[in-house]
A protein has these predicted regions:
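A residue-level marker of the well-folded mature domains of exported/periplasmic proteins
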Residues: 2-11, 18, 25-337
């Protein structure tokens, strides 16, 4: 989700490695080809290690097998690896795919390559993360990330019931659409605006647990009595909790998050996270493959935005905020159960 710039030499090395891996249909970048159908659809994720993208790949493969088509896959070596995604698109177009599904790492930098693919007649659908501008792809299949943030903001506000809040926001990175939408949604749900004095600390984490732990430690040094922590995702929530626990403050702080992975839902059940907004990567991918196959067979293109749903998961429901319990969350979660 990060658009962090890299040194030119590093980018070149990553791009060359990704090209070799895709050509070989295997290797450390996660590139592969599966299935024997004449129709080819590509899936390019941000990484191959995050359980969210593992579940997305599983959903795409299941749908490809059902449809009898060939699925080509590739992934960046790290979150923010635009060079590998550029190379993957170019190689998939050369391989004759009819559709490409992509979770863009750099929502702006990837656009020229997407435009070239579309100009050659390839359907391109963004999954999870919209490009900037959003209409750079034919369609977007994703969580309503503003709603995901709003739900946890409403939940936190209801739980606090007017008590003074001192809020830390552990965000993604500047300029990344998903992070901005979730952050803004949380503020809207809590009923505050940017710059509100109740926001006592904001730190970027890249959605990484270790960075989030460091960020939370920094926030606690600045404001020891923080009592609400918004986190961009569940790894960031886990990092925040570790920092709070080390400081002996884990009992008095409300942590809310977004993702709905199995590890995160288990943390809700354990009381580490109070509530999380669950999203559905398998659905994004399966609908994406279905749309790619439809285009290949009929010429009909998916267009616009398809909301793949979001559900607030908590075992401490609050009046006026729709939610489901962790039993529901575990049944619908992604990652190791």
């Amino acid at each position: 989700m990060s658009g962090t710039s890299r040194k030119a030499a590093g980018l070149l090395a990553v791009a060359v490695a990704a090209a070799m891996a895709l050509t070989a249909c295997g290797g450390s970048s996660g590139s592969s080809s599966s299935g024997s159908g004449s129709v080819k659809v590509g899936l390019i994720t941000k990484t191959e290690t995050n359980p969210f993208f593992v579940k997305m790949k599983d959903g795409a493969q299941k749908e490809a097998d059902t449809e009898g088509v060939q699925l080509l896959t590739a992934a960046g070596k790290f979150d923010g690896d635009n060079a590998s995604q550029v190379t993957a698109i170019e190689n998939m177009v050369a391989a004759g795919v009819k559709g490409i599904l992509i979770t863009p790492s750099d929502t702006k930098a990837i656009v020229p390559t997407i435009q070239k693919a579309r100009a050659k007649g390839v359907l391109v659908i963004a999954l999870d993360t919209p490009t900037d501008p959003q209409d750079a792809t034919d369609a977007l299949f994703a969580t309503d990330n503003l709603k995901a943030g709003t739900l946890i903001g409403q939940y936190a506000k209801a739980l606090f019931a007017g008590k003074p809040a001192k809020i830390a926001t552990l965000d993604l990175a500047p300029g990344i659409t998903v992070g901005t939408l979730r952050h803004d949604g949380f503020l809207q749900g809590f009923g505050i605006k940017h710059g509100d004095p109740s926001i006592v600390c904001s730190q970027d984490t890249q959605g990484n647990q270790a960075r989030a732990q460091t960020a939370m430690e920094n926030c606690l040094q600045r404001t020891p009595d923080i009592n609400v922590v918004y986190t961009i995702n569940e790894p960031a929530a886990a990092g925040a909790y570790q920092a709070l626990k080390a400081a002996g403050k884990e009992k008095g702080v409300l942590i809310v998050s977004v993702d709905g992975g199995c590890a995160g839902v288990k943390n809700v059940k354990a009381g580490i996270i109070a509530a999380t907004s669950q999203q559905y990567p398998l659905k994004m991918a399966s609908l994406g493959v279905e749309a790619g196959v439809e285009y290949a067979r009929t010429g009909r293109k998916a267009a616009g935005y398809i909301d793949t749903g979001v559900t607030l998961i908590t075992d401490k429901p609050q009046s006026g905020v729709d939610s489901k319990d962790t039993s529901f969350g575990i049944n619908a979660c992604w990652g190791a159960k």
